[in-house]
Amino acid sequence: MESTGMQSTGQRVVITGAGSGLGRELALRYAREGARLALADINDDGLKETRQLVADAGGWSFSQRCDVRDFSQLAALAQSCEERFGGVDVLINNAGVASGGMFWDLSLEDWDFQIGINLIGVVKGCKAFMPLLLAQGNGRIINIASMAAHIQTPGMSNYNVAKAGVVALSESLLAELQPLGIKVSVVCPSFFQTNLLDSYHGPDHQSKNDMAKLLESSPISAADVADITYRESEADHFMILPHERGRLALEQKRADPQVIYQEMFKLAARRLQQG
């Protein structure tokens, strides 16, 4: 466990998956607001880089290696936050991995890997910090999901299911925790410019190539998503949809889902033609 920067008296913020991508940008966004940060990841080098960037931005942080599949490591992170901060104001369950492949090509191990990190990792994160939040009677949980929870693109069924589960979990927590003074938000970005594919796990390369094209063509970056997440969660918005195209697609699905399904049929047919 290491710490850097000058400690402030701002919000106490925990971020999993803080070693790169959106997690890093969230750390920098909160650092600019004077937050005290607990940064967690399995990427030790990435954590070190994020910690230095936070310090350069005038923020204070400590880091702790944490695999979100291991509840004992998350519980240890919560204990460190209690010892160093005396509590937690914002918990951001951000750690996640990319995956893809047609359903018949995905193994049960592929499903276990994806669900274990992207869904159960969020469940365990919430569970590990819940005693602190309940004892405080306040705080905020921000779970990072995806537009894949709402618009299920072919060739990534296990990812779609995991992210849909995060949305369902977040809606459940929203209802259960609101009377107790604990706020909940869920963030559902479309693909954006980040290094998500570094964690790609799947049986074929076509899905990875398709994802790479979507990432490269995104009009917004991880820093943009982090800024939107900060602003909208502070405004107590529950469902945060950073991409305009994602918002429009969801509106279309609600109005006439068959239109979206027809687009998904075309995508699946194109994917099968590509092999």
Q: Where are the language model's segments positioned?
A:
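Active-site-adjacent segment of SDR/Rossmann-fold oxidoreductases
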Residues: L26, E33, I151, S172-K183
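Active-site helix of classical SDR
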Residues: C126, A162
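Conserved glycine-rich cofactor-binding loop
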Residues: G19-S20
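SDR active-site lid
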Residues: P179-E244
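Residue(s) in the substrate-gating loop at a strand-loop-helix junction
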Residues: S146
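Substrate-binding pocket helix/loop in short-chain dehydrogenase/reductase
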Residues: M102-F103, S107-I115
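The beta1-alpha1 cofactor-binding region of Rossmann-like NAD(H)/NADP(H)-dependent oxidoreductases
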Residues: D44-D45, R65-A76, L108
